[in-house]
């Protein structure tokens, strides 16, 4: 039987808020729960082709399970117990980023990202089609972050939309803090106050079979 245990009620509430945002963006979304050393990390895909993640203290058994977001949300918000059955039956599509090898690049004021997001939303509304904003707009680099001799990290608009859509920036006023940009050779990560978004920096090449 699948069990998710998050003893701290505040952290259960944080995880519930994370899952609620996931469901609001996509009713059919899945959440992948992975156990760490005394922690549980939740992963979800967003409509922006960006992963969202949040870590809380707790346990999950089995240690790597994918569940429907709606069922997990019900378990967290209705049962309100330390330990709940998060459901089962999900099949995760795609890969997750590595757990190690991340290098911090720089900290960016959350208020600055909020301003960039608002400008991006205005442009997206002007250019939205039947399927929403075009991919070319979402892929536009809106922020370039660099440190020392390391390659610059180019942050596309879709990452900011994911941060905003998941509510990770919170109240992005003057005292909203910073968003930490980290990277590996092929992934980028933006850690904000209430969660993080992750996206591949390098698109995997298709395998051609002759």
Feature-to-residue mapping (PLM):
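Generic detector of ordered, mature protein regions
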Residues: 17-19, 31-32, 46, 53-55, ...
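Long, compositionally biased intrinsically disordered terminal regions
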Residues: 72-210
């Amino acid at each position: 039987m699948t069990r998710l245990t998050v003893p701290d009620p505040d952290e259960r509430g944080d995880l519930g808020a994370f899952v609620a945002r996931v469901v609001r963006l996509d009713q059919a979304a899945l959440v992948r729960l992975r156990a760490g050393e005394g922690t549980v990390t939740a992963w979800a895909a967003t409509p922006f082709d960006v992963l969202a993640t949040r870590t809380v203290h707790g346990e999950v058994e089995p240690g790597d399970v994918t569940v429907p977001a709606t069922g997990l949300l019900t378990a967290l918000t209705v049962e309100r117990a330390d330990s709940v059955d998060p459901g089962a039956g999900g099949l995760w599509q795609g890969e997750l980023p590595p757990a190690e090898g991340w290098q911090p690049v720089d900290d960016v004021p959350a208020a600055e990202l909020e301003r960039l997001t608002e400008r991006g939303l205005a442009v997206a509304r002007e250019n939205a089609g039947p399927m929403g904003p075009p991919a070319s707009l979402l892929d536009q680099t809106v922020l370039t972050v660099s440190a020392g001799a390391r390659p610059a990290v180019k942050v596309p608009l879709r990452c900011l939309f994911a941060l905003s859509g998941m509510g990770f920036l919170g109240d992005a006023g003057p005292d909203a803090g910073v968003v930490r940009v980290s990277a590996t050779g092929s992934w980028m990560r933006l850690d904000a106050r209430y969660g993080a978004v992750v996206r591949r920096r390098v698109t995997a090449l298709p395998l051609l079979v002759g």
